[in-house]
Design a protein with these regions (language model features):
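The beta1-alpha1 cofactor-binding region of Rossmann-like NAD(H)/NADP(H)-dependent oxidoreductases
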Residues: 68-80, 113
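Conserved glycine-rich cofactor-binding loop
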Residues: 24-26
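Conserved glycine-rich Rossmann-like NAD(P)H-binding loop of the short-chain dehydrogenase/reductase
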Residues: 38-54
Length: 261
């Protein structure tokens, strides 16, 4: 883990403070940019420092911190939150976004254990480590409290073919969200989850040319603008702490979801 501050003036010291994981690309980048444009100060976390700097450069005049972080490593996560608190003094929001689909299209009987473990370490263990670190900080800071938004998936509801590791971790993330939400109540910590379907990112680019369907066919699927996801996350983030979107589902209108199994 290492941190580098992107020095940009234009956001006051009273700005709300967010930590966004997986901020170097895709949904994480879109959400980070949306928050920065809205005046939040943001700690941008991800495995590739170069892409984090690219995210920061998209919003001139913002205040942000880039922190190289592998969320599956406890020391990296501890360092991320230490860097954020040292720079900004508190954490008001965690967008718990870092994740991986893993090896797509691999039948369960052929899935290597190491591939399974990598998905679990990133999607579930990483989400837990980040939520735990945020929870500890939000509980002890003054004023107490904050918000955690977990990035679930449509796969938290229904699977795609040959996606056992991804689907299992996203179902588990829903349990994590519910438990954190219950345990956070006494400390003014609101916890919610956004389940996203087919936002246009590098991860979903293949869906526009063809994705495996439950009937065995390969068919293209519609996608939606990732900026619409970012605006939804910002809405959830900016609610007062006495209000919480527990679960939100945002998907491309025509994608196969209802009845896809």
């Amino acid at each position: 883990m290492n941190a580098m501050e992107t020095e940009k003036q234009g956001t006051s010291g009273q700005s709300r403070i967010a930590v966004v994981t997986g901020a170097g690309s895709g949904i994480g980048r879109a959400v980070a940019v949306e928050l920065l444009r809205a005046g939040w100060s943001v700690a941008l976390a991800g495995r590739r420092p170069g892409t984090l700097e690219e995210t920061a450069a998209l919003v001139p005049g913002s205040v942000c911190l880039t922190v190289r972080t592998d969320v599956s490593r406890p020391d990296d996560v501890a360092g991320l939150f230490a860097a954020a608190v040292e720079r900004f003094g508190r954490v008001d929001l965690l967008f718990n976004n870092a994740g991986t689909f893993g090896p797509g299209g691999v039948p369960v009987e052929e899935l290597e254990y190491e591939a399974w473990r990598h998905v679990v370490d990133t999607n579930l263990n990483g989400a837990f480590l980040c939520a735990q670190a945020a929870y500890r900080q939000m509980k002890q800071q003054d004023p107490q409290g904050g918000r955690i938004i977990n990035n679930g998936s449509i796969s938290a509801h229904t699977p795609r073919p040959h996606s056992v590791a991804y689907t299992a971790t996203k179902h588990a993330l829903t349990g994590l969200t519910k438990s954190l939400s219950l345990d956070g109540r006494p400390y003014n910590i609101a916890v919610g989850q956004i389940d996203i379907g087919n936002a246009a990112t590098d991860m979903t680019a293949r869906m526009q040319t063809g994705a495996l369907q439950a009937n065995g066919e390969i068919a293209p699927e519609p996608v939606m603008d990732v900026a619409d996801v970012a605006r939804t996350v910002r809405h959830m983030a900016e609610l007062p702490l006495e209000a919480n979107v527990q679960f939100a589902t945002v998907l491309a209108t025509a994608m196969p979801y209802v009845g896809r199994g």
